[in-house]
Amino acid sequence: MIAPDLTMDIPTELGRVHFVGIGGSGMSGIARLFLAAGHRVTGSDSRDSDAVQALRELGAEIHVGHDAAHVGDADALVVTGALWQDNPEYVLAKERGLPILHRSQALAWLISGQRLVAVAGAHGKTTSTGMIVTALLEAGRDPSFVNGGVIGGLGVSSAPGSEELFVVEADESDGSFLLYDTSVALITNVDADHLDHYGSHEAFDDAFVRFASAASELVVISSDDPGARRVTARIEGRVVTFGEDPAADIRITDIVTDGPVAFTLTHDGVSRRAALRVPGRHNAINAAGAYAVLVGLGVDPDDAIAGLAGFSGTGRRFELHAEVRGVSVYDDYAHHPTEVRAALEAARTVVGEGRIIAVHQPHLYSRTRMMAGDFARVYEELADHTIVLDVFGAREDPIPGVTGALVSECFEDAGHVDYLPDWQEAADRAAEIARDGDFIVTLSCGDVYRIIPQVIAALERPAGSPQPAASSRPRE
């Protein structure tokens, strides 16, 4: 994979910008903002998608597939770290000496000079960002924003606003969250992840200390998460903590998780009851952090509570795709044991007497090797049956011996897990197990959501009908 130079000097003018992998959730949102700012935008992606079509309608010229000719007369290239070094567009740009910007560099360049709210953390970034944006709009504010997922009720992951206020989901996975000139920083947690990039837990913590220390106005940070507490102890300036911890500046109590979550927030001696439209204890925690940011931005506390109640979720966060013969099919972006636990606990609060059939696609070979046992323990505790697919490698080369079988082999009861690298077999198995009232939940930040049409088709197939041919995953 490529390693963009995050320290490079960016030209004052970028001219025509070419995005490689423009259909991705983060890239498409940034491309939308470049279009809104009047830039000529071109791009390429491995496949067509709704995001690609939406950008075309806004004026972007987008090619399906990768070819050096697609670069055309571009003045700069925008990429992610999940790009192979032999990508022909990247190779040509290097040969021409074009500026090659990481997506976060491009965004930081575009929004320079604005008051910036940056949301970081190993888990909960996308949801927390969506909550802040939704509540600001409900309160009559008009920020610009870019999120890692489509925000429910808005139908987009990014949009320009009329205020000099920008809300961004900041990606810590490769250190690029340190590029922003942050005014208000929200740190949801500092649960060690991405150690393939950082190398150690200490280096991971250090990055968050740098991120928080750079915030010019306010740091909002969890008081429940041990990693966040380590960071808090090392930073100065205005800090507001949130959580169930009795010492938190904004304390969460009386959480009710039977269906959409409800809870009490106590701040400056005043307690307010809050309710959300999304399930899960973790979303009460996310909402508390968002509330702290909103109040820090000058939103009236009661308006902040009302605005959070309008949040209806984000794409790929416990997202319902279909209900077939009484079986609900959900997708969730969870790709770390902590996130999987939160997603399955949320599912458990709404499934009632039904069962949870989890379809897990391990993400990254390094994470699978390091956390296979942790994943297995969470799934065995909270899912009634788990189907494990093979590893989605993303930016990594395969590691010998590391497959999805590592996860399934860690289950204490082999009767509650299947390792099925063939996607059609996995879809058929999920449909075979499921009965009226059950949930089938796909979990990964890879492309596991693309198995959902196969799952739906398997659920709709009459008993005894011929099975489709095997397939490792849907074709591009």
Swiss-Prot record:
Domain of life per record: Bacteria
EC number per UniProt: 6.3.2.8
Catalytic activity: UDP-N-acetyl-alpha-D-muramate + L-alanine + ATP = UDP-N-acetyl-alpha-D-muramoyl-L-alanine + ADP + phosphate + H(+)
Subcellular location: Cytoplasm
Signal peptide: none
Protein keywords: ATP-binding, Cell cycle, Cell division, Cell shape, Cell wall biogenesis/degradation, Cytoplasm, Ligase, Nucleotide-binding, Peptidoglycan synthesis
Any one GO molecular-function label of the UniProt entry: UDP-N-acetylmuramate-L-alanine ligase activity
InterPro entries the record matches: Mur-like_cat_sf, Mur_ligase_C, Mur_ligase_C_dom_sf, Mur_ligase_cen, Mur_ligase_N, MurCDEF_pg_biosynth, UDP-N-AcMur_Ala_ligase_MurC
Residues the record lists as binding ATP: G121, A122, H123, G124, K125, T126, T127
Enzyme class name: ligase
Functional pathway: Cell wall biogenesis; peptidoglycan biosynthesis
Alphabetized Pfam families for the sequence: Mur_ligase (PF01225), Mur_ligase_C (PF02875), Mur_ligase_M (PF08245)
Gene Ontology biological-process annotations: cell division; cell wall organization; peptidoglycan biosynthetic process; regulation of cell shape
GO cellular component terms attached to this protein's record: cytoplasm
Function description: Cell wall formation.
Listed NCBIfam families: murC
Similarity remark: Belongs to the MurCDEF family.
Entry protein name: UDP-N-acetylmuramate--L-alanine ligase
Organism taxonomic ancestry: Bacteria, Bacillati, Actinomycetota, Actinomycetes, Micrococcales
Gene: murC
